[in-house]
Amino acid sequence: MALSLRLITLLFGLSAGLSGHSAELTPFLHYYEASYEGLPFNARGTRSLERRSDGRFQFETTLGALFLGVEEQATFELDDAGTPRPLYYVTRQQGLGRQRERRLVFDWKEERLTRTGDKPREDPLTPGTFDPLSWQLALKQRLLAGWPARDTVLDLTMTDGGDPTEMRWRVRGAEALPGPTPEGEPGERALVLERQFETGSEERMTLWFAEADGALLRLEHREKGRLLTIWLTARGDAPPP
């Protein structure tokens, strides 16, 4: 399936680190559309963040299009600096008669990461590691704490239950958002980040974040000659606590 799970999880979420106190997380509900070169239709999805009655946070994303459906959910708490510390993560993917589910359990006391469902395994857990969703909120916090200067490189570590992935994002600066905004106003200013891949890689990924609240406005990911584009279409009411 061209719209792979790995691509989809990149939608939904530092040489400058996550030091000091992080910006406060505010519940939200955002609506998105996605297009992929070679497919004659768009997918639609949501991203939402809520704070539960037990004080923990729940970050959810959904994406669906005809024969494809993907759901992700991350449960996390905040560490002493106010940065997300993942506890549980689950993803479910179904389409073309196939189903797949993966669960991650982060045991910080024992420093152990357990993956069940798809390709079960256990690995040591390194402090500061994020799940496939919570890293996006940690990056958003870093931006809201103070917009970094042009060419600043933001680093973080993410795991989907396999070997950790070191992600590096270069700040390209403030630019006009391609195309009209959800309100139909062209030229909205956004902070643009580009992911740095290994030298020689043809893979490209660019993120546009709203200057006002750090919302993800647009994502472009080109891999193997095809472009995946995801854009914000509307903001809704935040989920109730």
Task: Mark where each language-model region is.
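Bacterial Sec-dependent signal peptides at the C-terminal "C-region" and cleavage site
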Residues: 16-24
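Bacterial N-terminal signal peptides
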Residues: 6-16
